[in-house]
Design a protein with these regions (language model features):
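N-terminally biased helix-coil "hinge/interface" segments that flank
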Residues: 1-672
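Short, low-complexity, charge-dense intrinsically disordered segments
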Residues: 671-689
Length: 689
């Protein structure tokens, strides 16, 4: 038995699962709340529980896999280390003229003479003196460098020389060379601005992921788990943590990718739609030939369209912990904001039940009835005094928003201040959610049922309906929303620009197909050609009904609630490298390798040289990424175009060779140690809680 430990840090929960890699069986699973102020707290709790539930000794774990939203969140929130972007051969006037400066993802940008043309020819000598001056000037000022050369994907010589200069002039960090990212290492595709932006984002993320992996490693070591640590990339493959620290941009969309891989493993479906509904969001992605469908144009993260190929996922703010509100016209709205369910917070703070009773006893519901706020920490740098005062008031326990709104000390602006503190994850808001609705309906009874019932009564009174009818409507609306988003994703993948608001007829037909117009004489039915695999903790409650609306078979596999954690260990190590061959006139051909360019008299000789040069390098990289038993395949794509009036003749434009290295993760050798029983695991759990 080879035991692997999968960990996923989600928006609401951190999941851990123990998987027997030999049989594929899930041995145990556990959850803990994600602790944003320190992710390792939630990781420690979830891992200790999984070990305890599975009766597994820490030294029996042979591999650890981690999927994390950290890189994605850091990009969206604009966080990252201090970096300098060195641009070789770029035209600063052109960048300014077309407004590309804002697209470079770096404030400190240095333009250096040099660069190449589309054929890989040097257009100007590299300004090594300018590069040296720029690097020395930033000693002690930056945490990483990013380098992007004009047409460096055709000839990376200048990028490689500047990298060597940085590593020579900058002091190493903890025994490793100073962090440097080169654009040609992240992508082989053309787009100078996006490539520079991707390199800059990667450099910004290096300190963040380095800190996470270091603290995760300490947490695991503290629990006695010393197995190798792997990280999930955005395409669902695994790499060793040390590799991920150099290329953290490749971990964007790591969580959704792990969920698709986990869904494939648990459900055994090679062709399916995967709907992962969690506490905060719902992710929708496609499985094709047993692999996550990848967006070849690059992952979109916030406002940035990177050049990193990652899972093609559609994300919407809909989950079990989505806030349920009524708008000014009495219509029910679910999400996109995530809040703590009333039932969950009341289980820890039973005084909330008395407050809800008092609000129900009032002649009319007060503003923000059924909502509470709780401080998650003491403060943060840069807070205004009014914010600090508000945090102190929320530190003792959940405070009703109605009290804050009516307070002479804070007044109506308190709620606006609260939203700013929520955005910084300093405050947690609690309100009625779909999870509360399931408690009222008796379909889920984990926390305080009375608090959920009182919250339903408060909201039902505002809407003029019964609590049971309200909760049934909420559950149905979540299912309808999930079905709508899958239709949106499917049509978008097929090239249809979906604009429901601008197409009332299409929207009317969809509403009738999803049961939103029960009195209509027109009955519509949709039929999805592929099954739906539903995963996530609340999947069973909502997605089977969504599948009914879409005429699809729904599979909710065992352990669906921890599919992301399972996906963090069942994937393989996959590395790709693309090389190009381009004609130089009629009888010469240039091979563009990542290490430089070479010229040949025929295409076939160039192909043979690539087959000789690339596999050994790629095999070694796969080994460094944590793979064993590596196999390498090559795909060849010749590009031609018809010659006008040429009687069917075609002209040769070039050849793309894609080399793919696939291996299984290398696992650690477990050493027999003194047995640590359930009691000791529980003691670890107590200390980390």
């Amino acid at each position: 038995m080879t035991i692997a430990l999968g960990i996923d840090t989600g928006g609401t929960y951190t999941d851990a699962a123990l998987v027997d890699l030999a049989s594929g069986d899930v041995l145990s699973a556990a959850k803990a709340l994600t602790t944003y102020h320190d992710l390792t707290v939630g990781i420690g709790e979830a891992v200790a529980r999984a070990l305890d539930h599975g009766g597994c000794r820490p030294d029996q774990v042979a591999m650890v896999g981690l999927s994390t939203t950290l890189a994605t969140n850091a990009i969206v929130e604009g966080r990252g280390g201090r970096v300098c972007l060195l641009l070789i051969g770029y035209d600063p006037e052109l960048i300014q003229q077309y407004g590309f400066q804002a697209d470079l993802a770096a404030e400190d940008v240095v333009y250096l003479r040099g660069g190449h043309d589309g054929a890989g020819n040097e257009v100007a000598p590299l300004d090594e003196a300018g590069a040296r001056e720029a690097v020395l000037k930033r000693r002690g000022q930056v945490e990483a460098f990013a380098i992007s050369g004009y047409f460096a994907v055709r000839n990376p010589e200048h990028e490689r020389r500047v990298r060597a200069l940085v590593e020579q002039l900058m002091p190493p960090i903890e025994g490793h060379p100073f962090p440097v990212t080169c654009g040609h290492e992240l992508t082989s595709r053309l787009n100078s601005v996006r490539r520079a932006m991707t390199a800059a984002l990667n450099a910004r993320l290096i300190p963040i992921l380095r800190d996470l992996i270091a603290t995760a490693r300490r947490t695991l070591d503290g629990l006695g788990v010393t197995a190798p640590l792997m990280v999930v990339r955005g395409d669902g493959s695994l790499v060793r943590a040390e590799w991920a620290m150099r290329r953290p941009i490749e971990t964007v969309l790591s969580g959704p990718a792990a969920s698709v891989v986990g869904a494939r493993h648990l459900a055994g479906q090679a062709h399916a739609w995967v709907i992962d509904i969690g506490g905060t969001t719902t992710d929708i992605a496609a499985l094709r030939d047993g692999r996550p469908r990848v967006n070849l144009d690059g992952a979109q993260v916030g406002r940035w369209r990177t050049m990193v190929e990652a899972v093609d996922v559609h994300t919407v703010g809909l989950g079990g912990d989505s806030e349920v509100t009524a708008d000014v016209e009495g219509r029910l709205t679910i999400g996109p904001r995530r809040v703590a369910p009333l039932c969950m917070l009341a289980a820890e703070h039973p005084g909330m039940v008395d407050v809800l009773r008092d609000q129900l006893g009032a002649s009319s519901p007060p503003p923000y009835a059924g909502q509470f706020a709780l401080a998650l920490c003491d403060g943060a740098p840069g807070l205004a005094e009014a914010d600090r005062r508000l945090l102190r008031e929320l530190a003792a326990g959940p405070v009703p928003l109605a009290v804050l709104h009516g307070s002479w000390r804070h007044g109506p602006l308190a709620v606006r201040r609260l939203e700013g503190l929520e955005a910084r994850r300093l405050v947690l808001r609690s309100a009625f959610t779909p999870t509360d609705a399931l408690h009222v309906l008796g379909r889920f009874r984990r926390w305080d049922v009375e608090a959920a019932g009182l919250g339903a009564e408060v909201l039902a009174r505002i809407l003029g309906t019964s609590p049971e009818a309200l909760c049934r409507q909420i559950v149905e609306q979540v299912s309808q929303k999930a079905a709508t988003e899958l239709v949106h994703k499917l049509l978008g993948d097929e090239g249809v620009e979906v604009r429901w608001a601008d197409e009332p007829t299409a929207r009317a037909l969809l509403d009738r197909a999803l049961g939103r117009v029960p009195g209509s004489d027109l009955a519509c039915r949709l039929r999805l050609r592929r099954p739906i695999v539903a995963i996530g903790a609340p999947a069973e409650a909502y997605i089977p009904r969504a599948a009914e609306y879409l005429g699809a078979r729904c599979v909710v596999p065992p352990h669906a609630e921890v599919a992301n954690a399972v996906g963090a260990v069942v994937g393989g190590v996959v590395l790709r490298r693309r090389v190009l061959i381009r004609p130089l006139g009629a009888k010469r051909f240039r091979l563009h390798l990542p290490e430089g360019v070479e010229e040949f008299d025929s295409v076939e000789v160039a192909v043979a040289r690539a087959q000789e040069a690339v596999p050994p390098v790629l095999r070694e990289q796969a080994r460094q990424a944590g793979a064993e038993q590596v196999e390498i395949d090559m795909a060849r794509r010749d590009q031609t175009a018809p010659v006008g009036g040429g009687w069917g003749r075609r002209i040769y434009l070039g050849t793309e060779l894609e080399f793919i290295a696939v291996g299984r993760p290398s696992v650690g050798v477990t050493k027999p140690q003194r047995h640590r029983g359930h009691r000791e695991n529980r003691e670890i759990l107590r200390k980390t809680s």
